Amino acid sequence: MPGRLPPRLTCAFVALLVAPSSHSQSKAVVNEPSAFPSPETLFYSAEWRLIFAGDARLSLEPRKRSDKTEWESKLEVESGGLVSKLYKIDDKYHMAMEDQFCTTATNLDAMEGKRHHEVKVTYDYSRRKASYEEHDLVKNISKTAETEIPGCVTDILGALYKLRTLRLEPGQSAQIPVSDGKKSVSARVEAQEREQIKTKVGTFNTVRYEAFVFNGVLFARKAQLQMWLSDDARSLPVQIRARMSFPVGSITFTLDKVEHP
């Protein structure tokens, strides 16, 4: 359905959806800080209305293609606790990107409540087109769409990786071309304030960002998307929060663990 973001991806970067300074976290956070981009696996816990809502796992790996490096990212989101009893979610999102984090393909396999659907988007830069295919695996219904794209564009998760390379200072902003296969926009991202965020793995100095992709920009839903990135060379997405209107409210993903292969 146009303008509708899958519930879990709304929050992770889905919601998710991350910029730099020095860090004062404990040594338990990461043994050897690695500048971004580098291979990584990030683990998050989700909170909804002050209760545990589930877990997310986000990985990034390089893939050598002839003389250039491409990237592959996987996001897995699973509801937990009371939330899982109310509305079970098991989403798997896979994304391929070129060297500069230009998205080439995405695949979403989403099981949400009684729904089960698959969404594939292909970004064809030779044609400057993105093609969208959605299949409802329960009702056996399919939808397709196509939109024009620029020479380099990201999906909503790829925009997070692109943002991590920009190293914006508070008060600065950037425009990131984003497409979900049905619509293409130039999304504004603002670096707003430096803040300290406490997590299970330590305390991070971060920069808080806001990404303007809701309220009819890319997605019709009324919402606010904020991200806190570590203020260092890693630019880790320490926290991601989606604030939505009643009855959903706010969902927050907080970093629990970092692994570097």
Question: What are these regions, as identified by a protein language model?
Answer:
Residues M1-C11:
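Bacterial N-terminal signal peptides that target proteins for export
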Residues Q25-Y125, T165-P261:
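Acidic, serine/threonine-rich low-complexity disordered tracts
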Residues V119-Y161:
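Hydrophobic, well-structured mid-protein blocks that either form specific transmembrane helices
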